[in-house]
Swiss-Prot record:
Protein residues bound to beta-alanine: Q61
Gene label: panC
Family statement drawn from the similarity comment of this UniProt entry: Belongs to the pantothenate synthetase family.
Coiled-coil residues: none
Name listed for the protein in its UniProt record: Pantothenate synthetase
Length: 281
């Protein structure tokens, strides 16, 4: 497995692969990799001749009061995981490589970014879409792999690729959880022992909502209140948002319909965690 840090070097390798007509699977990450990322790499390995993982903590998708400077980083550990699960190449550029000058061009996806994390983190998806556009242009992958834990991101990226005619297939992969149900996240590393225990309230609240839906409850206000009331029992938890939206348009819905996404963001102490599930009639 190779690790490269410059656009010139990564393009040189990719040109050789393309000349041999090899398919390329791409897994974009910000590093501090876990089993969720591993599942994406494994899926890419199964479906492509070559696999690239990018590791880049993208500054332009963080707001001024967010955790860019403290976001966990461990390239050695990440590289070992990438190699273990079948990556051929790790692209780990410096910020100055991706943004050598002040950036004036940005990619925005409207409507789909109005709610959920897009509402709470105003610059986030502009930063995500801009950096992914750069990576897609640099790496020219056949397929790119994203986790369903970031459900809004997955929907936004699919729409961006469709609208801008990128010749890339976007693949969504299931949420990977700890044995006790907590969704795998790099930010779980911020949690102390008590917070880690308290974080289970996210999955617990969603399970209660799903149980009620499966029992025939159709009133989405009742479903939302089940989630709120469950989370409020946990003293360390502070709700950022609870949203019930159409799983395709990400617009709020008031009545149960064919496919809904229930997504939540909750602060456990100072750490913001997200989780979700899709329910289909």
């Amino acid at each position: 497995m190779n690790i490269v840090h410059t656009i010139k070097d990564v393009k040189s390798i990719i040109k050789k692969w393309k000349d041999e007509n090899l398919s390329i699977g791409y897994v974009p990450t910000m590093g501090y990799l876990h089993e969720g990322h591993a599942s994406l790499i494994k899926k890419a390995r199964e479906e492509n001749d070559k696999v690239i993982v990018s590791i880049f903590v993208n500054p332009i998708q963080f707001g001024p009061k967010e955790d860019y400077s403290t976001y966990p980083r461990d390239l050695d550990k990440d590289s070992s995981l990438c190699e273990k699960f079948g990556a051929d190449l790790v692209f780990n550029p410096e910020t100055s490589e991706m943004y050598p000058n002040k950036i004036y061009s940005h990619v925005n996806v409207d409507i789909l970014t109005e709610n959920l994390c897009g509402e709470k983190r105003p610059v986030h998806f502009q930063g995500v879409c801009t950096v992914l556009t750069k990576f897609f242009n640099i790496l020219n992958p056949t397929k790119a792999y994203f986790g369903e834990k970031d459900a809004q991101q997955l929907t936004v990226v699919k729409k961006m690729v469709e609208d801008l005619n990128f010749p890339i297939e976007i693949i969504g992969c299931p949420i990977i959880r700890e044995e006790d149900g907590l969704a795998k996240s790099s930010r779980n590393a911020y949690l102390n022992k008590q917070e880690r225990k308290s974080a289970l309230i996210l999955n617990k609240s969603l399970k209660e909502a799903l149980k009620s839906l499966k029992s025939g409850e159709k009133d989405l206000n009742i479903i939302k209140n089940i989630i709120i009331n469950t989370i409020m029992k946990e003293p360390l938890a502070k709700i950022d948002y609870i949203s019930i939206v159409d799983s395709t348009t990400l617009q709020p819905v008031e009545k149960l319909q064919s496919s809904i996404l229930i997504a939540i963001a909750v602060y456990i102490g100072k750490t913001r965690l997200i989780d979700n599930f899709t329910f289909k009639l």
